[in-house]
Regions:
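Short, intrinsically disordered, charge-balanced linker/junction segments flanking boundaries
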Residues: 128-132
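GST-like domain detector, emphasizing the conserved glutathione-binding G-site
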Residues: 1-126
Length: 132
């Protein structure tokens, strides 16, 4: 396998989970940090939708974070994450991608959401984190 190339954005939670799985699996990867305001032409050629993360490896492209995670774990899964209860795993993923992501954005960008103090958004997000 050639070295994988991951187009990423450090603050994107979907790119974060792709990086986490790649790191955990030990897959050699070169990470290209992307400015979302000036996306590289090379990335857009691989994935015209223009979202991160985008993984290029062995002539193929994976441009969904969960698919990148599953691919990485299929390469090497030392603690058996893929063997976990699929229904429980999917429920956590769904809660992360919906409710938690909603609160995370409000906490990270509190100036855009002045309806509540940022501490309220943080506390709402912590409810999910305590389940992990």
């Amino acid at each position: 396998m050639s070295e994988a190339l991951l187009y990423s954005f450090r603050r994107c939670p979907y790119a974060m989970r792709a990086r986490l799985a790649l790191r955990y699996s030990g897959v050699p990867v070169r990470i290209v940090e992307v400015s979302l305001k000036a996306k590289p032409a090379e990335m857009l050629a691989l994935s015209p939708k223009g979202t991160v993360p985008v993984l290029s490896v062995d002539g193929g492209v994976i441009d969904e974070s969960l698919a990148i995670m599953r691919w990485a774990l299929a390469q090497n899964d030392p603690e058996g994450w893929l063997l976990a209860d699929e229904a429980a795993t999917q429920a956590l993923i769904d809660e992360n991608d919906q409710g938690f992501k909603h609160q995370l954005n409000r906490y990270k960008y509190a100036e855009r959401y002045p309806e509540q103090p940022m501490e309220v958004y943080r506390a709402q997000g912590e409810v999910f984190l305590l389940k992990l």
